Curated annotation (Swiss-Prot):
Keyword terms, alphabetized: Stress response
Species this chain originates from: Triticum aestivum
Protein name, per record: Dehydrin Rab15
Biased composition (Basic and acidic residues): 78-93, 132-149
UniProt similarity note: Belongs to the plant dehydrin family.
Lineage, opening ranks: Eukaryota, Viridiplantae, Streptophyta, Embryophyta, Tracheophyta
Chain's gene name: RAB15
PANTHER family, A to Z: DEHYDRIN RAB15, DEHYDRIN XERO 2-RELATED
Induction remark: By abscisic acid (ABA) and water stress.
Domain of life: Eukaryota
Composition bias type Gly residues, residue spans: 100-117
Segments for region (Disordered): 1-149
Keyword Isomerase applies: no
GO biological process: cold acclimation; response to abscisic acid; response to water deprivation
Length: 149
């Protein structure tokens, strides 16, 4: 794209999307994981095409799972995090403790027991490490998940 009277000025070159071209002949010296390949273009001339290569990382997880009724459903953020944590319950996602009590779903009213069998949890009291370090996000998430003591 040329602007009024600024022909062949490399500082003002942009591609069809408005992105500036790199200066000083950096076309063959790209540091990204792209490679150039000449492909046949119009009238038999070669055109340069950039090819973006994927990293090949296998750390991603599927965003859907079997819904138990022959179909698929999207996973939520909680399920994805549970899969990545060690000791996560991938197959047994809904596990409620059974028992009798008069305190409702959160235990018999004393703060012990509960829907996930977490006896003795009293909130944030005593949750610090004693060294003045703050907990990370993953530590906070691990505390909230059942079976991660």
């Amino acid at each position: 794209m040329e602007f009024q009277g600024q022909h062949d000025n490399p500082a003002n070159r942009v591609d069809e999307y408005g992105n500036p071209f790199p200066l000083a002949g950096a076309w063959g010296e790209r540091t990204r994981s792209r490679h150039r390949r000449a492909v046949p273009g119009p009238q038999g001339r070669a055109q340069d095409r950039w090819i973006l290569h994927r990293s090949g990382s296998s750390s991603s997880s599927s965003s859907s799972e079997d819904d138990g009724m022959g179909g698929r459903r999207k996973k939520g953020m909680k399920e994805k995090i549970k899969e990545k944590l060690p000791g996560g319950h991938k197959d047994n996602q809904q596990h409620m403790a059974t028992g009798t009590g008069t305190g409702g779903a959160y235990g018999p009213g004393t703060g012990t027991g509960g829907a996930y069998g977490q006896q003795g949890h009293t909130g944030m009291a005593g949750a610090g490490t004693g060294t003045g370090e703050k907990k990370g996000i993953m530590d906070k998430i691990k505390e909230k998940l059942p079976g991660q003591h």
